[in-house]
Amino acid sequence: MAVAQNTGLFAEHGLKSGANMLPLPIEENVFLPFDWGYFAFVYDTSKMATPPASLDALISAKEDIKIAIQDPRTSTPGLGLLLWMKSVYGDDAAAKWQQLQPKILTVTKGWWDAYSLFLEGEADMVLSYTTSPAYHIIAENKNNYAAADFAEGHYVQIELAAMLKSAPQPELARQFLSFMHQQGFQSVIPTTNWMYPVTKTKLPEGFDGLVQPAKSFLFSPDEVAKNQKNWISEWVQSSK
């Protein structure tokens, strides 16, 4: 977010935010949040009766557990896992990545590449979101997918929208951003983007049994902008 803001391409929207359901606060004068979720490892309950209950448990698990994750250089979830590991382990993150390597089946460019491998049975767990099982419950009437609830806590993703300074009709852009916080927009987020709305909205059946992390992690945009390059380099070296 800080990198995007520093380009100077985006204008302050001047709107009063209605995002009262975020698990952690963010500055919203330029970028307006419209949905959010927690990163998590999803598994098939019919194949894995007892999933790891923490990042530590996953890292120290037997090598016959295989996970599919995404590349932090090309994927939002991949970057989310990088920040999650850094939030939990700090300076020890590189060592933890090295310990995790034997469990990593593959690192894909994008979310769907990894998730499809998981659905095909190639991986035991896949990096996704705590809300991913809701799709299977609601759209497919399948109840055998779940997100592992990790004791350390889960990293948050907040999706944002903004208006360009060069927008030919800035008032229409501002009106659309305002519309994104209205009930008509927010109410369809759970069953279209399969994430949580940012305003108080009745959630559909299928969301009520999802994992609710006891602790949330979220670096500030400035922290990510300052450290992202070095943290990715650390991940690359640890993955060799």
Annotate each PLM feature.
Residues 54, 96, 159, 168-180, ...:
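Short amphipathic alpha-helical coupling segments at ligand-binding clamshell hinges
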Residues 1-123:
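Extracytoplasmic ligand-binding site segments that recognize negatively charged/polar headgroups
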Residues 93, 197-240:
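An extracytoplasmic/periplasmic, membrane-proximal ligand-sensing/linker region
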Residues 40-47, 86, 157-169, 188-191:
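A bilobed periplasmic-binding-protein/Venus flytrap-type ligand-binding module shared by bacterial periplasmic
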Residues 1-4, 119, 123-144:
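A ligand-binding cleft/hinge motif common to bilobed small-molecule-binding domains
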Residues 23-24, 37, 65-74, 97-101, 107-108, 179-203, ...:
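Periplasmic-binding protein-like
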